[in-house]
A protein has these predicted regions:
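Conserved catalytic-core segment of nucleotide-activated headgroup transferases in glycan assembly
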Residues: 8-23, 33, 167-174, 180-248
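Donor nucleotide-sugar binding/catalytic pocket of nucleotide-sugar-dependent glycosyltransferases
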Residues: 35, 105, 112, 138-175
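Acceptor-binding helix/loop patch of EC 2.4 sugar-transfer enzymes
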Residues: 37-51, 104-134, 169, 183
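Membrane-proximal helix-turn-helix segments that form the acceptor-binding/catalytic region
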Residues: 62-75, 88-100, 106-107, 112-115, ...
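Nucleotide-sugar-dependent
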Residues: 85, 197, 240-275, 282-290
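Conserved acidic donor-binding segment of nucleotide-sugar-dependent glycosyltransferases
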Residues: 294-305, 313-319
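A short, well-ordered alpha-helix in the C-terminal region of glycosyltransferases
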Residues: 313, 320-335, 341, 347, ...
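C-terminal alpha-helical cap of glycosyltransferases
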Residues: 338-389
């Protein structure tokens, strides 16, 4: 797996690939992970300043990629998450695909063809190359997209496109239910610093609700929020606490702006909330409209009044929270769990180029028309394959 970050730190890696490592090994694959950044580099890359340390991390990352070249021959597949390097043209992608004839499975779970640079790395933004995404799509053996919007983009350049949703393990990890029989409820938001800005969308509604009701707001993140609200509990995210901290909450929030970048989001916050039986209120944008069923497992909110009224309904009715939460969990088990997606994920590594993976998660969208539906029984697997993950 060619990834950007060290193992066990990035949600897009943990829940899109690392989650399946045991499954791959069980099916005869030898798995190796190669990250661009080491742990020291990861610790500074999203912080302000540290220019010299960031430059050192970039240099080490490129050296690591160069050292891959003599090793690449032993791998049958390369699972590439986003890009070989965060800056520059797709040199490594071209080299490994065109020169070494490697089968690259190209995965992305954001609209990464759109320019996007964090404030902490504005200088590096001058060297980013979002346009390379379409080239990598053209060259890839297979493309794995986190939602239908991303798949439709990739389909412009490559017929071999797979809908591969982000999933959680609902049996071994996300296997507890939130307790809704509490005197004081807690409203949750979880995410990284890059999505913390969206929480401001809910601020006015939450402020009004706090004038009438007594509740806590729990923010699970790697950066403290800056909100003019009372009863905020900031919890620094760790892999060890992500489930237990969320499971102590009763309502989940997923606000987004209505734009192309949000269309590329894969709804992971909702998947986390609902897997734990937490009904959710979200913006009606992108994949949120597929995950949330209005009034069944959550509510949509696109104005201050929507946020206020939807959250208020859930604050006032514990039975409604329980019912919607259980319904949401059932949907996550059926459509967004590790167990439901195992065959779909394994089929990524079919050696038959005509195999394009199925939408195992029933949908009525146009994507069903453009992706051939095949079952895992039709896949051809080479046991004892070496897989660079």
């Amino acid at each position: 797996m060619i990834v950007q970050y060290p193992e066990n730190v990035s949600p897009c890696q943990r829940f899109r690939f690392e989650l399946y490592k045991d499954l791959l090994k069980k099916n005869g694959y030898l798995v190796t992970t190669k990250s661009f950044l080491d742990k020291k580099g990861y610790e500074v890359v999203h912080r302000y300043g540290f220019v010299l340390k960031k430059m050192s991390a970039l240099l080490n990352g490129f050296i690591g990629r160069l050292l891959l070249i003599p090793q690449i021959g032993k791998y049958d597949f390369i699972l590439l998450q986003r890009e070989f390097a965060p800056i520059g043209p797709p040199i490594f992608e071209w080299l490994f695909i065109k020169l070494f004839q490697k089968k690259i499975i190209y995965d992305f779970d954001d609209a990464i063809w759109l320019p996007s640079v964090s404030e902490q790395n504005s200088l590096a933004g001058n060297f980013k190359n979002a346009k390379k995404v379409k080239d990598i799509c053209k060259w890839a053996y297979r493309i794995s997209g986190g939602n239908e919007y991303l798949c439709n983009y990739a389909k412009q350049f490559n017929e071999n496109v797979v809908y591969n949703p982000t999933c959680v393990d609902t049996e071994k990890k996300y296997n507890v239910l939130a307790n809704h029989d509490v005197e004081k409820i807690t409203i949750a938001w979880t995410g990284s610093f890059s999505t913390l800005k969206y929480l401001a969308i809910t601020e006015n509604a939450l402020k009004r609700l706090q004038e009438k009701y007594d509740f806590n707001i729990k923010i699970i993140c790697n950066q403290k929020p800056s909100l003019a609200l009372r009863n905020i509990q900031y919890v620094e995210w760790t892999e060890a606490n992500e489930v237990s901290e969320l499971a102590s909450c009763q309502i989940g929030l997923m606000p987004l702006t209505c734009d192309e970048w949000s269309e590329g989001k894969c709804g992971f916050k909702l998947i986390q909330y609902l897997s734990l039986g937490i009904p959710s209120v979200s913006s009606s944008v992108g994949v949120n409209k597929k995950i949330i069923e209005e009034g069944v497992n959550g509510f949509f909110a696109d104005s201050d009044e929507d946020w206020y009224s939807s959250i208020e309904k859930l604050i006032l009715n514990a039975d409604l929270r329980k019912k919607m939460g259980l319904t949401g969990r059932q949907k996550m088990i059926a459509q967004y769990s590790l167990q439901s997606n195992e065959s779909n994920f394994l089929n990524l590594f079919s050696n038959n180029e005509s195999d394009v993976l199925t939408l195992n998660h029933s949908t009525k969208t146009s994507l069903r028309k453009i992706i051939n539906i095949k079952t895992v029984s039709n896949a051809i697997f080479r046991r004892e394959n070496a897989l660079n993950i």
